[in-house]
Amino acid sequence: MRRHLPTLLIALALISAAGAAAAMQEQRFGPYDVRISEPSDGIWPGRLEILLNGRVVYRGSDRTYGFADSAPIGADLTGSREPMLAVSAYSNGGDCCFEMLLFGLGPQLRLAAPLPGGKSEGKFERTGGLWYYIARDWTFAGWKVDAASSPACRVVLAYQKSRWRLAAERMRRGALPGTLLNQLAAKIRGSERWRIKPSGEIEAYEPQLPTLMLDLVYTGNPAQAETLLDAAWPPKAEGKARFLRDFRRELAKSPYARDIRRLAKVSPPGESDSAETCERD
């Protein structure tokens, strides 16, 4: 058995090398060569290497990486005629999150500001000759309701005035008709998911309340969100003012808070029959 050991070790090494090779993805654009490696058994972390004219100019090895299939390498994502590379990065562990890394592939590599993804992976979409980045805002994950029922609002970003901003033309909607708003409020108010003590203290909220309020806020209708709160709040429940205060404070933590405030100032396209943008898939 001992005399066959070198042969066995060589065979195992060849198998291991074949697995490692199969785990590497590679794409090229002009003088750039981009390599993404993952261990064949899927163990974190992975490795990202960007080479310019054969020389490594960027290396990352603290996350799991993948090419953004929705944006081909060299795409002009910002409309500035700069070819770009988009790489999805995932940090494992308790603080896991997706992030979209962006690189300018000009004469010299440029590391651009990354785009957030949160607990789900963002993607690019090309419409009307423009590139948009679509993701979810997880600011309200676990707020007042369990994590599985909490809202995660869909956001659409476009590169405008030197940074990625909420695309008003894709986000802004008109206010809901009053009759529909009243119907939604009545359904929330009468939901059996409320748990209210005789003292008026709330033990459990109806998840549709923060979800629909955020639907309205993220489509540029914050005033109607507060109208919904007034109409949907159970008469026996205490703490409506505190709920609204906490809601505003949580909203201010969003990375898109400034753009959300501006969204309300954009003229709406007309009355809407739906504001569903924060309901999770």
Functional labels for PLM-detected ranges:
Residues 1-4:
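Positively charged n-region of N-terminal signal peptides that target proteins for export
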Residues 7-17:
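Bacterial N-terminal signal peptides
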Residues 21-42, 132-281:
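Acidic, small-residue rich beta-repeat scaffolds with periodic aromatic anchors
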Residues 29-36, 76-91, 126-140:
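Acidic/hydrophobic-patterned starts of short beta strands in beta-sheet-rich repeat architectures
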Residues 36-65, 80:
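N-terminal, Lys/Arg-enriched amphipathic/low-complexity engagement segments
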Residues 49-62, 101-115, 158-168:
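Surface-exposed loop/turn elements that mediate protein-protein interactions on large endomembrane-trafficking
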Residues 64-65, 116-121, 169-178:
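Short, solvent-exposed aromatic-acidic interface loops
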Residues 67-75, 117-125:
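Repeated scaffold domains used in trafficking and secretory/extracellular systems
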